[in-house]
């Protein structure tokens, strides 16, 4: 049997036996399993970090590390995150993996065993305009009380508009908007106010905003073109693929993907890729 056929059977078996407590996975099988088996054989596995490999901003677990080790024996691996490359590297406990940070504004590579940032792109920000727009949104939607600063303006030019502020307690952040309904209610208006940016519902309380040309799909494809991969040779693993999610451009761009509903399932979800 061809490897792609074996992969399809393995995916089907996995989804049947591992998802008694998470029935959404069996629904996703109809989309995911055929996607794994079309086109060229996979060579590059790209993945998100928060809510895919780890809980939001928590260290990489031993089980996730072991899964990455196994994947790395067969595929090239690429971490694609909304946060900065150094933050991602630290959260992964210095795991040796190539990283695209800030939706592609940063790139870090493992070169001769050493992890280092090889590219950083910076865009200017109209700070006064950003602060005014965020304040107007807070007043309209009732988020005028917050911890720390209203919006984080990164050195890269990326923005993080956290509804609870930049210094909210972790427990409060995790409990604030787990289904993203609060942020989805204002997402359209945030996009309209920040029309020069790509706007994503990121993290647990925030909107991530990048200069318009940056998103995960284009970041991956730039990396692929520079390193000799076709789109059909790539598979992406992420959790936030719905419209407005910070992985959504991957789905909209037509790249094959595996959706994660619970980061603790990551080791099982990648088993079919190891068949």
Regions found by a protein language model. Give the residues of each.
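Residues at the C-termini of beta-strands that transition into short coil/loop
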Residues: 103, 111, 203, 261-264
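Mg2+-dependent phosphoryl-transfer enzymes with acidic/Ser/Thr/Gly-rich catalytic loops
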Residues: 36, 40, 60, 212, ...
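Conserved acidic, metal-coordinating active-site core of Asp-based
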Residues: 145-235, 243-246
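Active-site phosphate-binding/coordination module
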Residues: 58-148
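Hydrophobic "anchor" residues on beta-strands that sit immediately upstream
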Residues: 44-46, 98, 235
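Non-catalytic pre-domain segments flanking phosphatase-related domains
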Residues: 4-47, 63-66, 70
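Asp-based phosphoryl-transfer active-site loop
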Residues: 41-58, 79, 220, 247
């Amino acid at each position: 049997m061809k490897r792609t056929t074996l992969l399809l059977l393995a995916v089907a078996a996995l989804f049947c036996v591992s998802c008694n407590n998470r029935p959404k996975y069996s629904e996703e099988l109809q989309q995911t399993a055929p996607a794994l088996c079309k086109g060229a054989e996979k060579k590059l596995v790209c993945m998100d970090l928060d809510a895919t490999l780890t809980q939001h901003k928590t260290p990489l677990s031993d089980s996730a590390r072991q899964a990455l080790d196994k994947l790395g024996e067969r595929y090239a691996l690429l971490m694609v995150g909304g946060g900065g490359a150094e933050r991602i590297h630290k959260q992964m406990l210095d795991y040796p993996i190539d990283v695209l940070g800030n939706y592609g504004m940063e790139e870090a590579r493992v070169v001769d065993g050493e992890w280092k940032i090889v590219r950083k792109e910076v865009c200017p920000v109209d700070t006064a305009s950003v602060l005014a727009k965020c304040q107007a949104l807070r007043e309209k939607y009732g988020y005028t009380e917050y911890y720390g600063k209203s919006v984080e303006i990164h050195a890269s030019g990326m923005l993080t508009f956290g509804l609870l502020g930049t210094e909210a307690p972790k427990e409060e952040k995790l409990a604030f908007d787990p289904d993203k309904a609060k942020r989805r209610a204002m997402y359209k208006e945030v996009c309209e106010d920040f029309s020069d940016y790509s706007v994503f519902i990121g993290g647990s309380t925030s909107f991530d905003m990048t200069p318009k040309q940056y998103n995960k799909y284009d970041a991956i494809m730039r990396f692929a073109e520079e390193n000799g991969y076709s789109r059909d040779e790539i598979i992406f693993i992420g959790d936030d693929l719905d419209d407005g999610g910070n992985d959504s451009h991957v789905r909209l761009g037509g790249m094959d993907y595996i959706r994660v509903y619970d980061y603790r399932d990551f080791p099982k979800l990648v088993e079919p890729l190891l068949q």
